[in-house]
Amino acid sequence: KNYNRIFRSAETMSFFERLRNKFRMLEFAIPFIPYISYFGEKGLKKGLSGFFKDPALQRLFTGENELLGCLIPIGWSYYGDYQSPPLGGSQVIPQWLQHVVSYYKNQVALQCCVKKILIKEGCCVGLTFDHRGHQHQVESKYIIAACDIETLYEQMLPPEAVPEKLKKKLKQADLYSSSITISLALDCPTEQLGFNEELIHLVDETQCYDAQISGDPLTTEISIIAPSLRDKSLAPEGEGTLTLYMPAFMNYQDEWKTEMDAAGNRLRGEAYHQLKQQVADVIIRRVEDKIAPGLRSHILFYEVATPVTHWRYTGNKNGTMMGARPGRKNMQNKISHYQTPVKNLILGGHWAELGGGVPIAAKAGANASLLILKKENRAAFECLAGYMDGKIPLESVLRNAAFKSYDNSWVRPLTPAEKLKDAKKPAGA
């Protein structure tokens, strides 16, 4: 409810719309203003004391550094688990998007790496990319970049294309941590080990706040969730999946015992793999000791993603999970923005906003498309903007002649567990 107050970016608005939006945003922000100054270990404790006198209740929020970080997530708790992944897991979202893009006769190119944004007279005109060792060039009137912003500004563009002042601010921006993510396959349902649908936060309350977020596997907080409990398509019958998540940083143990080659590639040798295993063992042992006795005896196999892994697959600086943090420093430095110094080059991923996660990524993609539609298809722009502002119902958008029709032909692919179940069925069953 009321998410439309903050969903549409001011960069897509006219002067008078921005003026009205400032009042709407002020109305949204006023309840939070009294709590802005409560941050740090002492400030957080003082702020929480205004809500809870019982120290035990205050300790429930030890994983945050700002009082706003405790208050705002409560507002994200939708009835009916609105933010839970769809049936089949989070991979269903990109699978569906790829289907829709292909449905409209557009091409999706995978395993590609953009090398350079082509510019002519201050305007982007295309890009070059590498696909399995072969160089390709694409001409384009607009480019929406959903990649790491520093990589875009410092490696894909000429040095003079982006002001040094902006690049300096981005280098100094406060970013979210990366993580250690351990995905466990179990020989039993997670319910058998005592897990339910809630996300469990495991933290040692005797440790100071800095130790709880340091990235040291012995002291850092751990989040635990059982995906297969909510979604039975993710594991074979009688088995289960468990995900362990711990904040982590690229600078841990000499950058995870990796080395950089001349081309900027991070080399992962035996020392890296040993450290990765050691950290995973510590985390699993802590969960076993405090939450699920005998956990290790039920593990069929598991996979571990480190900050290096997240960096390799996303390109995000230091493997950060969600880009730039919401906060006073990043807001004052205007870290979030859609329109870049290069005309028609638009940011469309979580780097366009402060914060991250699926809602922010969806917001960024929608606003990036609005900026283009505003110039290229006014009818579509007005309809979509009206929907994002909460003025037009979805049914009206779907009937609008400005948009091509879609037949809802997508069918969710079977998960590996579902494929295994089908393979075990008797012939003709």
Question: Which role does the model predict for each range below?
Answer:
Residues 53-68, 223-225, 284-354:
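A glycine-rich dinucleotide-binding beta-alpha-beta segment and adjacent secondary-structure elements
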Residues 85-86, 115-236, 389:
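Mid-domain catalytic core of redox enzymes
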Residues 187-305:
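C-terminal segments that line or cap access tunnels to active or ligand-binding sites in enzymes
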Residues 350-373:
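A conserved FAD-binding loop/helix module that cradles the flavin
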Residues 244, 428-429:
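Extended, polar/charged low-complexity intrinsically disordered and coiled-coil segments in eukaryotic
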Residues 113, 119, 373-416:
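Active-site-proximal substrate-binding core of FAD-dependent oxidoreductases
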Residues 3-104, 111, 309-326:
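Active-site/ligand-binding neighborhood in enzyme catalytic cores
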Residues 108, 112-129, 301-316, 387:
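Beta-rich nucleic-acid/ligand-interaction surfaces
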